[in-house]
Amino acid sequence: MYLPQEIIRKKRDNKELTAEEINFFIQGVAKETVSEGQIAAFAMAVYFNEMTMPERIALTCAMRDSGMVIDWSHMNFDGPIVDKHSTGGVGDVTSLMLGPMVAACGGYVPMISGRGLGHTGGTLDKLESIAGYNITPSNDVFGKVTKEAGVAIIGQTGDLAPADKRVYATRDVTATVDNISLITASILSKKLAAGLDSLVMDVKVGSGAFMPTYEASEELAKSIVAVANGAGTKTTALLTDMNQVLASTAGNALEVREAIRFLTGEYRNPRLYEVTMALCAEMLVIANLAKDEQDARAKLQTVLDNGKAAECFGKMVFGLGGPSDIIENYDNHLESAQIIKPVFADTTGFVQAMDTRDLGMAVVGMGGGRRVASDTIDYAVGLSDMIRLGQTADNQQPLAMIHARNEEQWQQAANAVKAAIVISEKQPEATPEVYRKIRPEDV
């Protein structure tokens, strides 16, 4: 028998906690025998003293096991269960192509996703812009769609990692969000409760990333890879670039359109293509669905070219309550904004840099995202035809097309877009889409 305050005292004094102590504390969080004040004190003690790798693994496992851990064995899947998690960015629509692409190559992708908060878009909000799509199906429907389509993207239910929900809510109001140990446990407890065989992490780097510096992003990626593998789930991470909007669009219905056009081959933004292929290839390799990256990329290109990936997306949407013809007639099922006009730079020159976070906030300002969790979303608004770093902005080439509800909203967004993009006479050096890969042997 332990006392929560003694566990807090031990961490406060910078001593290593045992797995039993961490388990006891997190069970108390889930059962509500540990108070919010005690959670806050624990989080602050961890914030100042950090956790060792064994402590992080114990915390992640305790939070994962605080609720239901999905067991897929009764489904008799004839392939591995694999998933991807991104730390979030702007125009980061990879999940909508990646799930169907990996499914078409023989993987099963039961993806439990989140909503957007702050400048980052949420996969669930994007999918909810499709009329009828149900992000909270029963467990039976979740399993059935995963089996039949190979992929099902849904929202987190209350019975997955409930301790994380309480801990996160407290961290949010006590300035203890930005701590590597706590971030690692929060991300992985939810993902690992989905009963995965393997996981690929997409950790963003740059002006639109969650972590402020390359070094911090790399540290988080290494922590996640070490902890997930320590908790028994084969995991690798890719560090990918978020110094510019990843897709050509930012906004919910706009990004769904782009994802469908990507799957059908109508249009593939080159940076989005590279990041999506790199993540999918890594998923196939660690799930033993391909022998190496080259083999994986060839398989992925095949399912894009023969329409199998698009077909998996269509099956998923229909299976979760959406229309049966989303691939063929996507415009009939996605809202459009009343005003769609370009915004031009005030000067001519190369796009030197962009504040991706501010571009994300421009979409939020139009109603396309949330400032607080209770905000409602306008699915139609956002940006499309985004200019890329190194391109020339002039009176022919706009910075973006702005999709707005009215003139005033368009003007506010136009000012925000112009303020977020730096135009210069000098062409910037190209940045890679993928900086590095972190495998278990690297940590």
Curated annotation (Swiss-Prot):
- Record-level Gene Ontology MF annotations: 1,4-alpha-oligoglucan phosphorylase activity; thymidine phosphorylase activity
Asked whether the keyword Cytoplasm is assigned, the reply is no
Report the superkingdom from the record: Bacteria
- Keyword Phosphoprotein in record: no
Listed pathway(s)? Pyrimidine metabolism; dTMP biosynthesis via salvage pathway; dTMP from thymine: step 1/2
| Catalytic reaction equation(s) | thymidine + phosphate = 2-deoxy-alpha-D-ribose 1-phosphate + thymine
- EC nos: 2.4.2.4
GO biological process per UniProt: pyrimidine nucleobase metabolic process; thymidine metabolic process
Record GO cellular component, one term: cytosol
Cystine links in this protein are: none
Keywords annotated in UniProt: Glycosyltransferase, Transferase
Pfam families, from UniProt?
Answer: Glycos_trans_3N, Glycos_transf_3, PYNP_C
Top EC group: transferase
Q: Which InterPro entries is this protein grouped with?
A: Glycosyl_Trfase_fam3, Glycosyl_Trfase_fam3_N_dom, Glycosyl_Trfase_fam3_N_dom_sf, Nuc_phospho_transferase, PYNP-like_C_sf, PYNP_C, Pyrmidine_PPas_bac/euk, Pyrmidine_PPase_CS
Q: Which NCBIfam families match?
A: PRK05820.1, T_phosphoryl, Y_phosphoryl
The family note in this entry says: Belongs to the thymidine/pyrimidine-nucleoside phosphorylase family.
State the function annotated in the UniProt record.
The enzymes which catalyze the reversible phosphorolysis of pyrimidine nucleosides are involved in the degradation of these compounds and in their utilization as carbon and energy sources, or in the rescue of pyrimidine bases for nucleotide synthesis.
Q: How does it assemble?
A: Homodimer.
Q: Which HAMAP family match?
A: Thymid_phosp (MF_01628)
Q: What is this protein called?
A: Thymidine phosphorylase
Corresponding gene? deoA
